Amino acid sequence: MASPTDPQAQENFSDVRKVGYLRKPKSMHKRFFVLRAASESSLARLEYYENEKKWRHKSGAPKRSIPLESCFNINKRADSKNKHLVALYTKDECFAIAAECEQEQEGWYQALVDLHNRGKTHHQHHNHDGAVNGVHDGLNGDEVYGEVTPPGLAFKEVWQVIMKPKGLGQLKNLVGIYRLCLTNRTISLVKLNSDAAAVVLQLMNIRRCGHSENFFFIEVGRSAVTGAGEFWMQVDDSVVAQNMHETILEAMKALSDEFRPRSKSQSSSNCSNPISVPLRRHHLNHPPPSQVGLNRRARTESATATSPAGGAAKHGSSSFRVRASSDGEGTMSRPASMEGSPVSPSASRTQSHRHRGSSRLHPPLNHSRSIPMPATRCSPSATSPVSLSSSSTSGHGSTSDCMCPRRSSASISGSPSDGGFISSDEYGSSPCDFRSSFRSVTPDSMGHTPPAREEELNNYICMGKSSSHLQRGPQQRYQPSRGEELTDFDKVFRKRTHSSGTSPPTVSHQKTPSQSSIEEYTEMMPTHPVRLTSFRHSAFVPTYSYPEECLDLHLEGSRANHKDDGYMPMSPGVAPVSTKTNDYMPMSPKSVSAPQQIINPRWHSAVDSNGYMMMSPSGSCSPDNTNYSKIWTNGTNPKLSIDSIEGKLPCSDYINMSPASGSTTSTPPDSYLNSVEESTKPVYSYFSLPRSFKHVHRKSEDGNLRISANSGHNLYTEDSSSSSTSSDSLGGQDPQQPRKGEGCIQGKRLTRPTRLSLENSSKASTLPRVREPALPPEPKSPGEYVNIEFNDKVFSGGLVPSMCSLPFVQSRVVPQRENLSEYMNMDLGVWRAKTSYASTSSYEPPNKPVNSVCPTETCSSSRPPIRGKPISRDYMSMQLGSLCPDYSQVPPTRLSAKSITLSSSKSNYAEMSSGRVSDNIPAIAPASNSSLSEASRSSLLGQGSGPSAFTRVSLSPNRNPSAKVIRAGDPQGRRRHSSETFSSTPTTARVTTGPVSGEDVKRHSSASFENVWLRPGEIARRDSLQPSDHTHNGLNYIDLDLAKDLSSLDHCNSHQSGVSHPSDDLSPYASITFHKLEEHRSQAETEE
């Protein structure tokens, strides 16, 4: 490359400033370039010749001459072919020259820029009137904002690009060849051959920029004049695109550095140039991370930049603002709008972020618009920056790493001092206690992970009154710790319910471990505020309700507050109010409709003020007349709790009472058996027991009442260790201690059992759980039978009529066959050495009193276990008998034709027979232990037997009976629930039998029921065992609330089947089988 000769040496080249060989970028041909300064005859220009010889000899005109005055910008460039380029941008083209090295590039660039600036000074274009874009920004930058800079280049950088019809380019019709012009604060798009900029974008409006290959894009927010969108442009190659990216990024960084806080003197002196307050939306406490995003640095920008041809900025003022940190990841900071939410970032920053009360925070949107602040609103605090924000880009792009810390401190997202930190304020008014947030409340964790002692109630919701003192226990085993009380319910927060500290309490929906496989929540209601520490139960009981049954049941504090409005409370687990005007009775299997005088006088269950009760099988009666109580566990075997009811399937509001159902309405026994062995079977535990057994007139020295539930395989023996949820020992402290017989005093009578937990009982359980065999999927509700072993020493004179005037000792539970039926055995033994099997299917005249055992006879307590052949019955029989120790077998001929032995039967339950049998039958054959069980069911209930037992009553002649169990009537005068199906006849329908197949049993919830309770005279008359004419409509079950007065039946008669007459203070339940097979009916008529 030739160097120009000394201008002074050559007189003819006095205006030449620089000469030399340079290459043309496209053709890469070397040409001789000459840079001439302005003179009186010509302007400063750049010329090139074919070679130096032609230029020296003036043999011809230059190939090209470019006046520097026509160039609106001169920049150094680099591309993939040439790394040292100098580009001159004119109105219609971009002329570039390529140097051999960087020093040569820099020499030429400086010479061109000097001449270009001189030309502007000579023509006094320092006000930018002749500038292409009319922007005053030069190379020196704007040290003082708003002041006119010395004459210089119009833009820091200019790139010639091809705008693509994509994004905003298409929307704004910005397509074709444009010049992308960069200043300190703006980016302008100037169309080729145009004098004015088509679009001027503030650097603060740019969310992000990047490049991909030879494409470069800029994404702007909605605060830009074009709105939110992207500009895509194509350049010569990827090197140019990368250079554009890096250069714009540097400008964005420099812009952020320029707007650091200044002194008050600077702000006051420059108040004519209003600067917006850099603010961002800030929650009163901490915004959620979704509104904070990554930390980015804020920037300010000019809001009054003019187009390249627009001349100087109006009034020489511009407005700037910072971008909110709520922009998405990888975006540039953008200005904070002056219009928006008036909420202050925090109390400590309120004044510093306000322009004398006029500034506002912009909402946390992705974009905000720049609004210049008037000069009169300028304040010293106007320059306080907002936040530390950063951004990244997609592809190869990146954004500026601008730095603009707030005056207090630059907080980092994720720390407690910044909005990124997740605090409780993010979730508003959530009343959740943080203690429970540290533990999992999923059903699995609740069911398998016992919590720490101090956190036992965290996963439960205390819905009791704040004054109550409830015991709490581990949630897995439902076993309370004795003496442990909860005094502050308000400390335990709840979800999806009303306030736990308010009164009356509401029902909470809390999922229990036993319902992890089914629906959502379980109603939890508080129990009685005063509890004996010996009671092994907790303050809460899950009633296993389903979402449609989970109502907010408001309960009153006491029955004194209850006003009788003529309705019966239908809430599950709430006992009826003891009023004499109760015209309705709950029809739910678990609703309590017992006589009111037997209710525990300590405290009565509060009921809803509107007098309604939930008609749901999920309802449960409370053992202590309280609202709810946790299911009790076996005190002797704490592990045998009811923590395994995962097999329970969802059910409707009605319970299947068909023969194929499991035991539900059974009397709550103390030993829940075979729940471990039959873990694969679905358990339908709805605990529809009307009352727990409590003998008011019981004396502690009189004896024990053993009630044990069996699931069909092995009855509870004295060394039983099987799981039990409703095992209880009534009157005795140890269910495993041997039971001794004592004399039965006739003069004593027992009240109707009201609860299963006694004052002297160390463990109680009211909710029996009996396993079922695999049934068809349709019946989803349990059956009604329980093996009740009457072993109560207290059974004195007021004992069952079959037990009257007899020393009552323990009766052995008959060991069941391994495939025995699922009906529960009720084994009520009377110690009588010579008495034959009591009331074994004996049919008596109608006028003969219903008594099972003669007062002068005794029974043997040493009955050997009765074992029969393995037959396929689904239910257990209820056995009541006074067996002699030396009985052998009952001859089959001694049994009545109606006494059906099921030794080879395939029926699903042992039928009760009502045939006439001789009083002197010595024993029963093991093959016909179903007759034994039938006789047990026949003479199951007595006046003073203490427990109410359920004997199966089948009134349906068909094999697909509907099933329901209702509560017995109230001896205090409660009216019976009206029924459309059969009348309330005082005579008990005849007990006939017939095999019923378990698979034939279907679930019918439309059956009606009648409350039948037998008065003393009516039972004594025993008019007929024929079922009433109204009982032919397909019902299976009826609960008989037996007579309320036993005064007329103090004496006992022997060998009578049917239901025994109870005492006036004992109203036991009886579920009697009236399965009317036609041949049995005809036989009964023949005998009559």
Curated annotation (Swiss-Prot):
A motif (YXXM motif 2) lies at residues 521-524. A motif (YXXM motif 3) lies at residues 567-570. Residues 155-259 form the IRS-type PTB domain. A motif (YXXM motif 9) lies at residues 909-912. A motif (YXXM motif 6) lies at residues 654-657. A motif (YXXM motif 1) lies at residues 460-463. Residues 466-479, 499-516, 707-718, 840-863, 946-961, 980-995 have a biased composition (Polar residues). This is Insulin receptor substrate 1-B. It comes from Xenopus laevis (African clawed frog).
